[in-house]
Amino acid sequence: DGDGDLDLYVVSGGNEYSTRAPALLDRLYLNNGMGSFNQSTATLPHIYASGSCVAPADFDNDGDIDLFLGSRSVPWKYGLTPTSYLLENDGVGNFHIVTDDYNPQLASVGMVTDADWIDYDNDEDLDLIIVGEWMPVTVFQNNGTYLLDVTAKVGLGGTNGWWNCILTDDINGDGYLDLVVGNLGKNSKIWASESEPATIYIGDFDHNGLTEQIICYYKNGKSYPMVLRPDLIYQIPMLKDQFPTHADYAGKQITDIFTVDQLKNAITKNAYIFANSIFYGNETGTFRYQPLPAEAQFSPVYAIVSGDFNSDGWKDLLLGGNFYGVNPQRGRYDASHGVMLIGDGSNGFIPMSIQESGLNVTGQVRDIISITYQQGREAILFAKNNDKIQVYTVANN
């Protein structure tokens, strides 16, 4: 609200609520200047969305903080594209939806998980970087009056993944911002590439008014559904007659289960990259893709922080993740204990072992921050889902 103290914006979301549930409304808490927060109910538009993130920035250069609200999913209909929003501040802390004024495509950008505002083209206004599931690392260039989708132009077309988070920083010290992006990783039963993507089909296959999702992956050049027969029959009972036994279902491709018309009428989304990755910016205004080292691919990454942790003059990366909410046949993703990657000064990284880094972070990490305390000492805080915060101090040497 521009009164000189920090306020708190809380994004709400979840799959357990209907699309008009009050629990999906975001909340804004205004600071009274003495560390006490009061919820402001009149300053935000009523947006019922399963949100994932908020990215604050003065994107219109009028001196106040505006907001991008990223939506994660449509409740009960995973795979469908939710609506995201651009909110403009009127100067006194009231926000209005202006998505259509800057780019209507922004509303349907995808299943957003994270976003950030950066001036990637050095023209003194902020551009919007968005990541999410089944979508590319997406760039909207701010030309002062419009947010133009330049994803393909900057070399990020076809980067669709299951992206979880993004960190923007000049990692290699060349003066251009780089994008470090957390993904599924490569320690999984499902793989993806440009020629053999992971695919999701979304549709009402049995015409019962409910949306089904079928995820497929390639093996030996053929596309197979990930879902086991009992789970598929539970969702689409009409297939029981077609596949009465497990033997009947075994080895069936997606085209053996559904007709060409059924698949054609379904909404289809692809993912081509599962590697946790870095995209290096350069003087041409484009980004160059590079997967992070193998040690960074053992588990999904949901949190990233950068810093010169070994005081050698080069930026390092610290990654956290894991995900336990997985069905038994896929197995939970729990192989990360915190990954320290030491920058080598030549666009590469040297992974540190647990013994070398001292990190042994258990659980599902969802955020990492670095703080300074007690005579300039540095501490790293790991926030974990349904768990206590884990704290490490950075050694002076």
Located regions from the model:
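Beta-propeller-forming repeat regions
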Residues: 1-397
